[in-house]
Amino acid sequence: MQPVPQPQSTNDLHGLNDDSEEDESDNGVGLGDSEDERVVMKGRSKSKSKKQAGSDDEDDEEEENDYNNDEDHYLDATTEVEAKKSTSKKPLDKAKKAPKKNKTGVIYFSSLPPYLKPFALKNLLETRSFGPITRVFLSPEVRPASAPRRRSNKRKTYSDGWVEFASKKTAKICAETLNATIIGGKKGGWYHDDVWNMKYLKGFRWADLMEQVQRERSEREARKRVEDSRARKEDKVFLEGYEKGKVIEGIQKKNEEKGKKKKDSAKEVRMVFKQNEVKLGRDKSAEDPGRLGDDTKRVLGKIF
């Protein structure tokens, strides 16, 4: 038979119960504290992780900002370099595009040899080492209307001319050395004995010459238009006067004829009447002695 356990006292039970309850409560409290600590630790870890994430995000943002700032700084640097380049290029471009000073010289020829062409004049000057020559202009000779026409020779003659040299110094030396000297060259040349008549024009430009030539041309054309209009008016007046004179002459002729007729009518006019022929009747014969002529009467008188 197994021994039956004795029942414990209620106090002991209650005491045991109290101890157990206290232990349980203590254990409960301890468990609760540990759970709280765990929760707190979890919260801290979460907060730390959040803070770390936030810090990581902030670091990323800062890095991005730094990268953007670096990019902006790089762009600013490149723009500054480009601006410097552009500013450095601008004065160069301006210097390149700056208009060059007029360094050309112009010589005026007051007279030219007959039938001398522009190309021949340029060749004569360049053979004497006066060059380079940039432009040559010769004004043709204007012959008056009263001058006789040249039928045999059709070559042009020039009255004066201008020659532009690339250097003013060359133009001055050319004018000083060749003025009032013979053209020279070959002895049998066409222009050997002709004399140079030239002068260096100080401060004269080719544009001034072109303006002068255009002005003279316009004046000449205007003068020609005025002369043509005047000639047309004179022709018109002459034709009108000629036609009017013809009309007056016709009227005068008619008046003269009328006057002659009046004079002829004023003379005495003998009136002449035309007599009609008288016809004989049936009873009367043509042998009526009363109507015989003198000849018949004389013949009859001789017979009888």
Curated annotation (Swiss-Prot):
Keywords: Nucleus, Ribosome biogenesis, RNA-binding, rRNA processing. Gene3D superfamilies: 3.30.70.330. Residues 55-69 have a biased composition (Acidic residues). The keyword Transcription regulation does not apply. Its main location: nucleus. The gene is esf2. It is found in: Nucleus, Nucleolus. This is Pre-rRNA-processing protein esf2. Transmembrane segments: none annotated. One of its GO terms (cellular component) is nucleolus. It comes from the Eukaryota. Residues 1-98 are annotated as: Disordered. Disulfide bonds: none annotated. Residues 70-96 have a biased composition (Basic and acidic residues). Residues 105-195 form the RRM domain. Belongs to the ESF2/ABP1 family. It comes from Aspergillus niger (strain ATCC MYA-4892 / CBS 513.88 / FGSC A1513). GO terms for biological process: endonucleolytic cleavage in 5'-ETS of tricistronic rRNA transcript (SSU-rRNA, 5.8S rRNA, LSU-rRNA); endonucleolytic cleavage in ITS1 to separate SSU-rRNA from 5.8S rRNA and LSU-rRNA from tricistronic rRNA transcript (SSU-rRNA, 5.8S rRNA, LSU-rRNA); endonucleolytic cleavage to generate mature 5'-end of SSU-rRNA from (SSU-rRNA, 5.8S rRNA, LSU-rRNA); small-subunit processome assembly. The keyword rRNA processing applies. Residues 41-51 have a biased composition (Basic residues). InterPro entries: ABT1/Esf2, ABT1/ESF2_RRM, Nucleotide-bd_a/b_plait_sf, RBD_domain_sf. Involved in the small subunit (SSU) processome assembly and function, and in the 18S rRNA synthesis. Required for the early cleavages at sites A0, A1 and A2. One of its GO terms (molecular function) is RNA binding.
